[in-house]
Amino acid sequence: MSCLPVFVILLLLTASGPSVDARLKTKDDVPLSSFRDNAKSTLRRLQDKSACCGYKLCSPCGQA
């Protein structure tokens, strides 16, 4: 029982350590924020298209 506090302290120290990406960056790596921005712009574009067509999407926008 005397080593339980030491174990808890070590567990807390290792869990709160900074997370480091172990992989080396390459020129093809894209930051996650770029993916989020692309997803937001795609969703915005799709919402704009559905807004101009209304609730029924039987024909593309601008075509009757």
From Swiss-Prot:
<feature type="signal peptide">
    <location>
        <begin position="1"/>
        <end position="22"/>
    </location>
</feature>
<keyword id="KW-0872">Ion channel impairing toxin</keyword>
<feature type="modified residue" description="4-hydroxyproline; partial; in major form">
    <location>
        <position position="60"/>
    </location>
</feature>
<keyword id="KW-1015">Disulfide bond</keyword>
<dbReference type="GO" id="GO:0005576">
    <property type="term" value="C:extracellular region"/>
</dbReference>
<dbReference type="GO" id="GO:0099106">
    <property type="term" value="F:ion channel regulator activity"/>
</dbReference>
<comment type="function">
    <text>Probable toxin that inhibits ion channels.</text>
</comment>
<keyword id="KW-0800">Toxin</keyword>
<keyword id="KW-0732">Signal</keyword>
<comment type="similarity">
    <text>Belongs to the conotoxin T superfamily.</text>
</comment>
<keyword id="KW-0964">Secreted</keyword>
<dbReference type="Pfam" id="PF16981">
    <property type="entry name" value="Chi-conotoxin"/>
</dbReference>
<dbReference type="InterPro" id="IPR031565">
    <property type="entry name" value="T-conotoxin"/>
</dbReference>
<protein>
    <recommendedName>
        <fullName>Conotoxin Am1.1</fullName>
    </recommendedName>
</protein>
<feature type="propeptide">
    <location>
        <begin position="23"/>
        <end position="49"/>
    </location>
</feature>
<dbReference type="GO" id="GO:0090729">
    <property type="term" value="F:toxin activity"/>
</dbReference>
<keyword id="KW-0379">Hydroxylation</keyword>
